Amino acid sequence: MHALERISLDAYLPVYGPAAIDVGAATCLRAPHAPESPMLNRVVGLGVDGPVDEAQLDGALTAMGDTSFYVAISPSADASLDGLLQARGLEPGWGWMLFERGPSPAPSVETALQIVEVDAGTLDAWATVVATAYGLPDDSLPWFAAIPEATAWHAFLALDGDEPAAAAAVWIDEHAAYFGMAGTVPEHRGKGGQGALFAARIERALAAGCTTLVTETGELRDGSPSSSYRNIRRYGFEERFVVAHRLRPYRRG
């Protein structure tokens, strides 16, 4: 597994807690509160340490239950993995571009929004912004609300007056930082919230001595970057590689 993929996985393991299980060399990240979200339900690590063990592959697929989930196909994965997943009925999914930046200061940003670090009084507001931005069910709110208190995560909220406008978080461990959980309330888009949140998180990571800053988002489609992709580039992150995905759609009982 590439070092950037390892950072991403290490960041999310404390978020999933016991819902993250190992099946051989694979890690199954399971979010039963959001069974139709392949963004939250993923299998990572298959075939990266050697040839694919088909028994372990089938065990990992079984462990995901009836959720809609992605299976990550690392650039370093065994070449047979994609075909084995296709043979089991998994469809092509949306790959994720991994980005990296060094320890240079963040570009300046102008916004009327106020950036605050999340505390006990703003946990629920932060969780609501993130869940709403990704179209996730209310059942996911307690899961998101626990993230700012999870090991090594630091969460920030952008406020328009007293109204939550955007949210994001950064995981910091030794010299690595992972940027994730970013979302904006639709009516507050275009106000510079995510830019200001990037700047705040970069500042926090640099203050902690981080030298490798990592994030990811959906790969380019039709050559047109999303607003998330543009913001990532704007704040100094450089494209590194795409982790492809195979998708198994949600199975309704």
Residue ranges and their predicted role:
Residues 36-48, 175-186, 245:
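Conserved acetyl-CoA binding element of GNAT-fold acetyltransferases
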Residues 48-114, 118-119, 215, 221, ...:
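Acyl-donor-binding surface of acyltransferase catalytic domains
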Residues 1-7, 42-49, 96, 105-143, ...:
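Short amphipathic alpha-helix that is part of the acyltransferase structural core
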Residues 137-187:
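A conserved beta-strand-loop-helix scaffold within acyl/acetyltransferase catalytic domains
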Residues 1-63, 144:
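N-terminal charged segments
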Residues 19-24, 77-91, 152-168:
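Conserved beta-hairpin
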Residues 53-61, 181-184, 190-207, 230, ...:
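Conserved acetyl-CoA-binding loop-helix of GNAT-fold acetyltransferases
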Residues 12-24, 66-68, 93-96, 147-157, ...:
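A short helix-loop-beta-strand connector motif used in the catalytic cores of GNAT acetyltransferases and
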